[in-house]
Amino acid sequence: MTASKRVAKELDDLSKELPPYLRHLSSDDANVLVWHMLLLPDQLPYRLKAFGLRIDFPREYPLKPPTLRFTTKIYHPNISEDGLVCLPLISTENWKPYTKAYQVLEALNILVSRPNLEEPVRLELADLLTQDPEMFRKKAEEFTLQYGVDRPS
């Protein structure tokens, strides 16, 4: 099965049973290997808004993992300033070809609520979360309110 066919099937399957933390799932008109959606975290401080997310599937998918990037700024130790997600499940060394997109999205939803302080990409945010959790939450809430997208009903 080609990457395009597998990704199209996964998109169709996921669209039929969209998890409560996702909205507006779609692919690029010209390229099914690029998905767009809104992530609606269920934990504070991120549940105050929604966040745009893009998934790029390589032509070698499922042999190579997809790339996840937030298109909405988010204050999080495992997400770079340009939105790239550091998620162990999609790292080259951990990726398994039988992993499905819905599993990746489930892992991302958990990561947003429970940051992985073992593998941060923004060390200063991981340090702040460790040393002063209340200050981290306050800054994350301010950032979320400033940059987040209104949650659809």
UniProtKB/Swiss-Prot annotation:
It is an enzyme of class 2 (transferase). Catalyzes the covalent attachment of ubiquitin to other proteins. Functions in the E6/E6-AP-induced ubiquitination of p53/TP53. Promotes ubiquitination and subsequent proteasomal degradation of FLT3. Keywords: ATP-binding, Nucleotide-binding, Transferase, Ubl conjugation, Ubl conjugation pathway. Its EC number is 2.3.2.23. Pathway: Protein modification; protein ubiquitination. The active site is at residue 86. ISGylated. One of its GO terms (biological process) is protein polyubiquitination. This is Ubiquitin/ISG15-conjugating enzyme E2 L6. Residues 2-149 form the UBC core domain. It catalyses: S-ubiquitinyl-[E1 ubiquitin-activating enzyme]-L-cysteine + [E2 ubiquitin-conjugating enzyme]-L-cysteine = [E1 ubiquitin-activating enzyme]-L-cysteine + S-ubiquitinyl-[E2 ubiquitin-conjugating enzyme]-L-cysteine. It comes from the Eukaryota. Signal peptide: none annotated. Interacts with RNF19A, RNF19B and RNF144B. Interacts with FLT3 (tyrosine phosphorylated). GO terms for cellular component: nucleus.
